[in-house]
C-alpha cells in the first residue's frame, strides 16, 4: 500500500481577513485635499500676479515710472487731484505726478491706461468729458460745453520726455479719440488732459519740476 499523507486528516487553515476601519483612511484624506487645494490656488494667484512679467508688456509689476500731468480746461489749469487712493498701483500723491508702479495685472502692460489712473479715484475721463471722483472738489466738464461758446474736445497731449517738453517741444502725440484707453508708455513723461478747441496748442503740464522732487523712486 502506498504511504498515506500525514496531512490528509489535518483541517484546512482558516484564512483571516482584517476588515479596515473605513474612518481610518478618511482621517488624513480631507487635510491632504485641503492642503493641495490651497497650494494650487496660491500657485494660480502667483501666476496671475506675475503674468505681465512673462508677457514682456511694460510697465511690469517691477517697474516704477512717473509722468507729470495737468488738467487744462479752456486754458485754465485745474488743481492737482488730491485723492491718493491706490487700488492697483497707478495713482498720485497729490503732487501733480502720476505714479505708475502697478502691483496688479489689471494696471500693468496693456492695462496701464489713463482709465486705470482716473478710476483709482472714482473719476472718469473719456471723449465726452471729465467726471471727478467723490473726493475731488471739482465739477463735471463735458466736451459739449465747449470753450467760451466755441466747440472744443477733450484731448491728450503726450511727451515721451518731460524735460524736453518743459523746453517747449511739441507733443509726441495728440490723442482726440478713445482717451480712456491711452496707455502710459515710459518713465519721466509728461501728459496734459485738456478741453480745448481743435487745433489749439496744448501746453505741457506745469508740474514737470515735481519730477525732480520725487522721493519714492
What are these regions (language model features)?
Residues 2-217:
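Ubiquitin-like/PB1-type beta-grasp interaction modules and other compact soluble beta-rich domains
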Amino acid at each position: 500500500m502506498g504511504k498515506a499523507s500525514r496531512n490528509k486528516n489535518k483541517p484546512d487553515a482558516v484564512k483571516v481577513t482584517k476588515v479596515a476601519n473605513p474612518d481610518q483612511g478618511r482621517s488624513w484624506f480631507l487635510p491632504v485635499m485641503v492642503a493641495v487645494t490651497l497650494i494650487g490656488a496660491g500657485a494660480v494667484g502667483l501666476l496671475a500676479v506675475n503674468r505681465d512679467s512673462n508677457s514682456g508688456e511694460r510697465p511690469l509689476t517691477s517697474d516704477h515710472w512717473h509722468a507729470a500731468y495737468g488738467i487744462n480746461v479752456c486754458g485754465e489749469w485745474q488743481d492737482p487731484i488730491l485723492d491718493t487712493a491706490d487700488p492697483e498701483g497707478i495713482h498720485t500723491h497729490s503732487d501733480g505726478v502720476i505714479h505708475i508702479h502697478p502691483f496688479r495685472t489689471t494696471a500693468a502692460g496693456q492695462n496701464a491706461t489713463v482709465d486705470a489712473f482716473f478710476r483709482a479715484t472714482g473719476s472718469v475721463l473719456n471723449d465726452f468729458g471729465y467726471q471727478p471722483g467723490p473726493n475731488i472738489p471739482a465739477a463735471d466738464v463735458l466736451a459739449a460745453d465747449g470753450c467760451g461758446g466755441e466747440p472744443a474736445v477733450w484731448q491728450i497731449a503726450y511727451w515721451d520726455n518731460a524735460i524736453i517738453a518743459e523746453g517747449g517741444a511739441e507733443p509726441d502725440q495728440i490723442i482726440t479719440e478713445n482717451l480712456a484707453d491711452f496707455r502710459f508708455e515710459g518713465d519721466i513723461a509728461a501728459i496734459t488732459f485738456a478741453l480745448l478747441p481743435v487745433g489749439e496748442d496744448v501746453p505741457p503740464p506745469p508740474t514737470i519740476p515735481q519730477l525732480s522732487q520725487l522721493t519714492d523712486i
